[in-house]
Every structure is written in C-alpha cells, then in structure tokens.
Amino acid sequence: MTTRIDTKFAELKAEGRPALVTYFMGGDPDLETSLKVMKALPKAGADVIELGMPFSDPMADGPAIQAAGLRALNAGQTLAKTLHMAAEFRKEDNTTPIVMMGYYNPIYIYGVERFLADAKASGVDGLIVVDLPSEMDAELCIPAMKAGINFIRLTTPTTDDKRLPKVLHNSSGFVYYVSMNGITGSAIADTAKVGEAVRHIKKSTDLPICVGFGVKTPEQAAAIATHADGVVVGTAIVNAIAGELDENGKAKGDPVAAATRLVHALAESVRATRLEAAQ
C-alpha cells in the first residue's frame, strides 16, 4: 500500500528537505477552535499532522499535553469527534498526511474494526498508539495495515539491538525516534547523540526517521533537522495554544494565530537547515 505519508516523504526526499511534523490535541480548547488550528497548519508549513486523541490517563504525556487533553475532554471531545475533525479537514486538503496519536483504551472501547473503518473513511493515514508494544500487533497494528493505515512505532535511546527489530517489524510510514527518556516536553535533546541514534536505526530500516520529544524552538528544530528525515514538535504548539486561553481554558486571545506563527517559524528553520547543508 502507498499512503499519503509514503507519498509525502518521497516528495520531501526528492526536494532534499526534512518534514515538519506538528502535533496538537484534538478538541483543545474546543472542537471549533481545534479544527481551525488543524486547517491552518499546512498553510503555516506543516508537512504532516499528528492529531492527538484525548485520554483521561495519558501516562507518556507531560503536563502541557495532559492539560490539553483534559481541556478537550471537559469541552466534550470524543474519539468520534476527533475522527470527524479528520473528515472535515479532508474536505479542503486531500494531500497532507494525518496521523492520529494517543492510547489504545479509547480505540478499544470504540471498537477496533469500527475505528479502523471510520478512520479510513475520514482520511486518516497513520496511527501512533504509545501503549501498544509489538507483542500486541494482532490487536491493532496488523488490522490497521490490512485497512491501509500506517502503524508508526516509537523507538527510544534505550531500544537496544535485540529489541529494535521487534519494534520495526510491521512498522510503516515512518519511525518516531523519541530523543530522550521521560515524558513529552521534558527536556532538550542532545543533537549529536540524536544523529548517532538515527544513523544506527537507519541500518535496520528504509523507513524515514522522525525525531521528537524536547523540540521547542525553531533553533532546536533546525539542529535536529540536520540529522533526521523529520522533526516532530508537539508540546511547544500545545503551549502556544494554551497561552491564548483564560484560567478556565477558554479562548481569550487567538489560539489559531499563536499556533500558526510558531509553526511558520519552525517550518522556515527546518527548511533552511537542509538547504544550507546541501549547498
């Protein structure tokens, strides 16, 4: 199968530049605002969109993304509404890849077969489910592949040579390298070590490698971009949105403008980095 993710990374490889992968939480601070953010991301320079699925017990998320998920849930966001966001986005944009990211529990409750059918119909291209290890591929990974949806795995600095083949088995779309141990948004990555890790993973796969966790500024994104096929930014975007909200999580400023300003700056830095490296 060839998905929008495969097509996008092939295009970017031909252009000689890495991808900017942008994460935000579906339904934060509300469905309408969140959908506006989603629609604005490609115009601001996002190459791939990670659409967060809010969950009440997000063990791998830092405080910012946990708070975003809570705001979304309090505003009435559901998995069905998050899928609806993808479908609405697809009415205007049929090329930007959408990756839904979150935890298995909401998908399990929704029903795996129903979820995959609805995700495919809504124009979703990939899934990142952080709490489903490769030993549980039969639960969702293999059914997703059969449905034509990429299943994207996380690798970390502690993924050793014995574990790596298991992580990569049945992976598709791209590999998400978590540049440090811990929760999202927790620290700053060591770019030299990131480069070494990416080169090591590439010995075992032809999939693009995207690096995330700890990328907050355009400068950090540019530094990571010299080593990877893509840079993932999430917490910084979530924080940009949160900065425009009042103490009750309601918009007091312009969350859409704040998010797009940041993404535009990130995109400019990421794109310039590879161009400079190619000269």
Curated annotation (Swiss-Prot):
Signal peptide: none
GO CC, any one term: cytosol
Keyword line: Amino-acid biosynthesis, Aromatic amino acid biosynthesis, Lyase, Tryptophan biosynthesis
Annotated CDD domains: Tryptophan_synthase_alpha
An MF annotation (GO) of this entry: tryptophan synthase activity
Residues forming the catalytic site: 50, 61
Pfam families named among the record's database cross-references: Trp_syntA
Binding partners and assembly: Tetramer of two alpha and two beta chains.
Function: The alpha subunit is responsible for the aldol cleavage of indoleglycerol phosphate to indole and glyceraldehyde 3-phosphate.
Identification of the protein by name: Tryptophan synthase alpha chain
Provenance organism: Brucella anthropi (strain ATCC 49188 / DSM 6882 / CCUG 24695 / JCM 21032 / LMG 3331 / NBRC 15819 / NCTC 12168 / Alc 37) (Ochrobactrum anthropi)
Recorded name of the encoding gene: trpA
